[in-house]
From Swiss-Prot:
Region (Disordered) residue spans: 257-281
GO molecular function: ATP binding; nucleic acid binding
PANTHER family tied to this protein: PTHR31583, PTHR31583:SF2
Protein's UniProt name: Uncharacterized protein YHR218W
Top-rank lineage group of the source organism: Eukaryota
UniProt lineage: Eukaryota, Fungi, Dikarya, Ascomycota, Saccharomycotina
Organism of this sequence: Saccharomyces cerevisiae (strain ATCC 204508 / S288c) (Baker's yeast)
Entry-linked SMART domains: DEXDc (SM00487)
SUPFAM superfamilies: P-loop containing nucleoside triphosphate hydrolases
Pfam families reported in the protein's UniProt record: DEAD (PF00270)
Length: 603
């Protein structure tokens, strides 16, 4: 193949056929640079550029042709480096917990990985968050001798001090679950300023100490990534390529222990932080959204629905729970605010809705996407491909909410979105959970909900929990089961609604306000529906008599029978097949089987 096309061949093999045109930005007739640096106008593929921007905060670096091939390996094997990072942090956690004073190397891990106040919570909630962001740095460390941008670093070290990447890979091999001696020695050398890459780990150590000491509410991931990136920028001499603000003074906490005094370190590089712009909201936004969805004659059902819809859209309350009767219009309480958010031009909001069962998905997506007011897609698309920049609302089931892949994507939202779309104006909107009482009442599924506790709820602007059957005790227990604080001590009557004050704490640390639209002394919901409570000797026989009578009068009717156990569901379905066309379903069925049953119901 012609030399000038050889690099394109490499990229095409990496980027997967159907996405090549989406990610390549090369001109068609690429000149031959004979293995030298490629000028910045010939941008690297988008995914590689994303990693470069994440680590170095510059859009383009001058890599040679071999560098591109090496960097592309990261995206071909991203899952491997994620798992490698998780495993390294888990080992560090084990060492820090079990042998904190064994040696200087072990103390290094104790300081770097845990910081005593959070050593117990690291393994449960922090490893995957830090591991996801550690993966690119781990990749660079393992390939430090293959990339031209690190040639000066390798050349500056004596032969015996150069990083032996092959030995490092062997030492991190899964077949050696406890031995990480070479990796730990490299980390120890870095901490003791034996090479310039030590700035990265020293910064990480200092930031974690500062976080635990001051109890900062700023997300640790953002702080750690930001200052680590600054160290890379400083070390590579890229300050001129990245617009930073400088200060001539330094805080004592910003001085890394053991750092030699030098005029080169008199300036502190501060990462430019941009606040997300927020367009002003008004009650008129909800009215406009209602007319888009229902037409010009739109009106709210009652004053309560109006005021609660405004509370969800306008107030800063981070977490809201609503109990309302069936048919009241709970969906509109979040549907209209979502349409209003989608109308904002300067900020793109991405929200998520989770329902308890697969059979509810299709109809839910159709309802929420009608009239083209919202772009709706399955959560599975987000889990597999990430945010596409178009979808306003992703809809999934509880299993998706509890999945590790979903929680990992939310944990890395800030970095991935900023680098993918070159803006921080793509923002997480609402997390909406329908029929949330199931977290507490569906005992047989509770083991499946454990992963929800790992979700970073604070990343969302607001969490909304809806139910028709969630009295305070059930609602409070359900919220605590997924890792939230629970309900506020006093549930709010809708008539006590007041505009909430600004909140400085995160969603997960603030109690949820519950609004109860079911009054004990009020008229029974759905009063036009005939209801009978009967005590009988044989419930299945009595139910069969009622069904036979119904279908004799109304042959085209449909009926739903709710049984108390999964075994009874299957027994009734088998015994009644000679009388009716029966479709049965229960919670222990897999998603595929539920989908087949759902099609049968629709048919």
């Amino acid at each position: 193949m012609d030399r000038k096309r050889s690099f394109e061949k490499i990229v095409v093999s990496v980027m997967v056929g159907k996405n090549v045109q989406k990610f390549l930005t090369f001109v068609e007739d690429e000149p031959d640079f004979q293995g030298g640096p490629i000028p910045s106008k010939y941008l690297i593929p988008k995914k590689i550029n994303l990693m470069v921007y994440t680590l170095f905060q510059v859009h383009t670096l001058k890599f040679n042709r071999k560098d591109y091939d090496t960097l592309s390996l990261f995206y071909l094997n991203r899952g491997y480096y994620n798992e490698l990072s998780f495993r390294v942090l888990e080992r560090c956690y084990e060492i820090a917990s079990a042998r904190p004073n064994d040696s200087s190397t072990m103390r290094t891990f104790t300081d770097f990985v845990s910081g005593t106040p959070i050593v117990r919570s690291l393994q449960k909630s922090t490893i995957r968050k830090y591991g996801y962001n550690l993966a690119p740095y781990m990749f660079l460390l393992l390939h430090v001798d293959e990339l031209s941008i690190f040639s000066a670093y390798q050349a500056s070290l004596p032969g015996e001090k150069k990083v032996d990447t092959e030995r490092l890979k062997r030492d991190l091999c899964p077949r050696k679950p406890t031995e990480i001696k070479y990796f730990s020695q490299i980390c120890n050398d870095m901490m003791n300023k034996k090479d310039r890459l030590g700035d990265v780990l020293a910064t990480a150590q200092r930031i974690r100490r500062r976080y635990n000491k001051n109890g900062s509410s700023e997300p640790r991931l953002k702080t750690l990534d930001g200052l680590t990136s600054e160290r890379w920028i400083q070390w590579l001499g890229l300050e001129s390529d990245y617009h930073c603000s400088f200060s001539s003074t330094r805080n004592a906490e910003d001085v890394v222990a053991g750092e030699a005094a030098s005029s080169d370190h008199d300036q502190k590089i501060s990462r430019v932080t941009r606040k997300r712009p927020r367009e002003p909201k008004s009650t008129n936004d909800i009215l406009v959204a209602g007319r888009k969805l229902f037409g010009s004659s739109f009106e709210f059902r009652d004053l309560h629905q109006l005021r609660l819809c405004h509370e969800i859209y306008m107030a800063d309350t981070p977490s809201v729970a609503v109990q309302a009767p069936p048919g009241y219009g709970k969906t509109e309480l979040f549907h209209l605010p979502l349409i209003a958010l989608a109308s904002k031009g300067d900020v793109k909001y991405v929200s998520f809705l989770f329902v308890p069962y697969t059979v509810l998905l299709a109809n839910c997506m159709i309802r929420l996407g009608r009239r083209g007011c919202l772009n709706v897609a399955p959560v599975r698309n987000f889990i597999e491909e990430g945010c596409d920049g178009v979808t306003d609302l992703y809809v999934g089931i509880y299993d998706d909410l509890a999945s590790t892949n979903f929680t990992d994507r939310i944990a890395a939202w800030e970095n991935i979105v900023e680098c993918t779309f070159r803006t921080n104006n793509v923002k997480l909107g609402y997390l909406i959970v329908d029929e949330f009482h199931n977290f507490e009442t569906e005992v047989y599924r509770q083991s499946q909900f454990g992963g929800i506790t790992n979700l970073d709820f604070d990343a969302f602007e607001k969490a909304i929990f809806l139910s028709g059957t969630a009295p305070e005790a059930v609602a409070d227990a359900a919220l605590q089961r997924i890792g939230l604080t629970g309900l506020a001590k006093k549930s709010m009557d809708i008539n006590e609604l007041k505009r909430s004050e600004d909140l400085s704490r995160g969603l997960s640390s603030y109690p949820t306000r519950m609004f109860n639209l079911i009054k004990e002394k009020s008229e029974v919901p759905l009063g036009h529906v005939h209801k009978i409570w009967k005590k009988v000797e044989s419930q299945p026989e009595e139910a069969l008599k009622l069904l036979l009578a119904l279908f004799e009068i109304e042959p085209e009717s449909k009926a739903i029978v709710v049984a108390s156990t999964t075994n009874e569901v299957e027994e009734l379905a088998c015994s009644w097949r000679k009388y009716f066309r029966v479709v049965w379903i229960h919670g222990k069925l897999g998603c595929c089987r539920k989908g087949v049953s759902h099609k049968g119901v629709c048919h």
